Structure formats: structure tokens, C-alpha cells
Amino acid sequence: MTERVCVGAIAGAFGVRGEVRLKSFTSQPNDIAGYSPLYTEDGNRSFTIRLTRPVTGGLGARLSGVETREQAEALKGVTLWADRDKLPALPDDEFYHADLIGLSVYDTGGALLGKVRAIYDHGAGDILEIFGPGRRQVLLLPFTRAFVPTVDLAAGRIVADPPEEQE
């Protein structure tokens, strides 16, 4: 099976003719159209994408097979996935979120902190959510070189230098 990466989500219908409001997770939002066809997470549906215009909160787009507002509304919240081999290779110091999720995270002394469970981007930069055995709560860690000096995808590990935790 082809490995896929989440590249966007449908935020809802736009207009009355089946157009959708698309939220792109790609570094250049318009690049999402170049990765067509895009698939639903379960892989049961695929869409070719034609971007129509910028809209508040994303991009207006036409999806193949979506002709009415009702069909577009039914897709609200659906994530869109691209074949991994269609995505560009990244420089050495950049990573796809999908590659980081599940990696073990160790502090600079070698103690296991947990695993990356999720990654959030609220505009100011990525935040790693780390959870593991013995943790009472998740550790939210800015994904910057200061806090995460080493990412070794081949070894499946991250070395982090988190701030002191407050009790």
C-alpha cells in the first residue's frame, strides 16, 4: 500500500455550486492542487482538486464528483491525503509531521521522556505533544533547535532539552 501524508482538510461548503473551503497544510497553500488525486483518510474516495480563489480561512476549490452544496457540506471535516512519493524532498533540517509522530523522545541525559503523539501549529511555530509512561500530563515542547537539538529519523529518536517542569 502506498504511504500517504495528510496535506489538507475540507472546512465546509463555499457557495451554492459544490465548491468547498479547503484548508491546506502545505508550506505553500496552493501547492496542494499539485498533489492530486487526494484521498480520504480511509482511501475509499479520491478527488482531483481545482483551486478557484482565496477565501477567508483557506482556499476555494472544486473537487471532482462534488456538484452540489449538500455534497460539499457532507465532506466538512474530511482530511485529504496525498501519496508520499508526490511530495517534494525536504532539506536536512525540515521534516514532515507524519515522520515525527511516534518517535521516541529522550532528554539530553538519555532519559526517555515519551513519544511524539501529535504536532500542533498555531502560527508561531510547531509544538510537539509528548506523552509516555510515568507522565501525569503531556509535555508540550516548541519544535525549535534550542529545545530539540537532534532529530534522527533513521534511529527513530529525538533528543530534546525541555525546560524544567513545574510540579
Curated annotation (Swiss-Prot):
Any one Pfam family match given in the protein's UniProt record, by short name: PRC_RimM
The keyword Glycoprotein appears for this protein: no
GO biological process annotation, one example: ribosomal small subunit biogenesis
Coiled-coil residue windows: none
Keywords: Chaperone, Cytoplasm, Ribosome biogenesis, rRNA processing
Entry's Gene Ontology cellular component terms: cytoplasm; ribosome
Molecular-function GO terms, alphabetical: ribosome binding
InterPro entries linked: PRC_barrel-like_sf (IPR011033), PRC_RimM (IPR056792), RimM (IPR011961), RimM_N (IPR002676), RimM_N_sf (IPR036976), Transl_B-barrel_sf (IPR009000)
Function: An accessory protein needed during the final step in the assembly of 30S ribosomal subunit, possibly for assembly of the head region. Essential for efficient processing of 16S rRNA. May be needed both before and after RbfA during the maturation of 16S rRNA. It has affinity for free ribosomal 30S subunits but not for 70S ribosomes.
Quaternary structure, from the entry: Binds ribosomal protein uS19.
Family listed: Belongs to the RimM family.
Protein name: Ribosome maturation factor RimM
Annotated organism of origin: Paracoccus denitrificans (strain Pd 1222)
Encoding gene, per UniProt annotation: rimM
